[in-house]
Amino acid sequence: MSKAFQESEIRFNNLSEEALEFFVEHGYVVLDSVFGVEEMDESNQVLEEMRKRYAGDMGLDLESYDERICQWRDMWMTEPQFDELLRDNRLIQAAQFFMRQPSIQLIHDHVIRKPFSALNSTIPWHQDYPFWPVDTPDALSTWTPMEDVTTSGGCLEVVDKSHKWGVSPPVDFIMDPMDFSERKDVIRIPVKKGSMVVLHSLTWHRTNPNEDKGTNRPAHISLWVPSFARYRPDLSDWHPVNDHITVEAGEHLNVDKFPRFGEFDESNAPSPNSDELHTGPLKLESTMDMFSATPRIAGHIHRIIGDNQRGLPVRKLVDYANDEEVRRVVFERSLEKGIISEDQEKWLEGIFERMLINSTAYLRHRARNVYNDAYAQWWFHVGVKWVELWDNLE
């Protein structure tokens, strides 16, 4: 039986012209053994200790935490081991080399785990650049696994040469997953721990579930732009990196939260790019999207419990999810309207529990469930029915 995908077999051992030509042509490149096995084991150990610490801070055991949380942002800001990794010349020089820029700037970094026995699903097809509030798509990301990753272990998949297609609006992981299953140019990239995949910011990519028993598939991802990139909040005003930006639109990113590497000559920087590079995410009042899921669900609950009629402001989702009386009222009123059945009480309680854990983890540690499953289940089984009911009353 033939595979439904191609497997990437081309590897490079150094920053060569051949490697650069491959990246320019295909939109990705694999560098073998950039970091040592012991270095990756140390980073993985730091990640485990951090997870235990965060779980304890939230009153959870590690198993329960791992069933709910799988992504941690801004690792370089909180963990010295990852700050050291991010500033390592092997990583910096690779990013500079493939971007063909002497000076580069970090957008953000994060770690994503896909443990076989816990939180483990598909991260849908997407390009990276449309999520970033900057004015140039000529950028890249690095993907470094801390364990060996096989073709069945949640490795990266790319659409070969798709960086040449141009910029698309940001993909909504909840409502609008892209489908490239019929394409013959989808390539899976198995890699050893410490190797590095470099992706152009316009290359379409995803990861499938990890099907390899006994593995966790932790990977460190860093995302980079040229230092001449300028702030464009109109392109991505919803992304969490905006929390760290202190400059005005059209200015270069502040270096305290977006560290710069390599000498930057601002006098030679190109003028601000005001082109409409993409139209931004499609946000509809009648549906759910990942770009505004948290305030949208808070708005649903605000109306379900009648706080809108009492003139009370909308509270944060974490406050609603942590309020037993709110959860009780939502269940009873949803049951009364025929939106859910009596035997779904525990199911709805589970939705609230997951939203509480997700919201708390993000507020405390900038950690989250990258799959948005609790938000999606709320919308498809509860939220959409309430919205239809309200629409019929108006």
Walk through the language-model features, giving the residues of each:
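Non-heme Fe(II)-dependent double-stranded beta-helix
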Residues: S2-H26, D32-W125, P130-P133
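Non-heme Fe(II)/2-oxoglutarate
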Residues: F5, T203-W204, N208-D307, G311-Y320, ...
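Double-stranded beta-helix
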Residues: E21, V149-N208
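Short, surface-exposed loop/helix-turn segments at secondary-structure junctions
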Residues: W125-Q127, D172-D185, G214-N216, L235-P240
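Short, conserved beta-strand element in jelly-roll/cupin
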Residues: P133-T150, L223-P226
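Charged, low-complexity interaction regions
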Residues: G338-E342
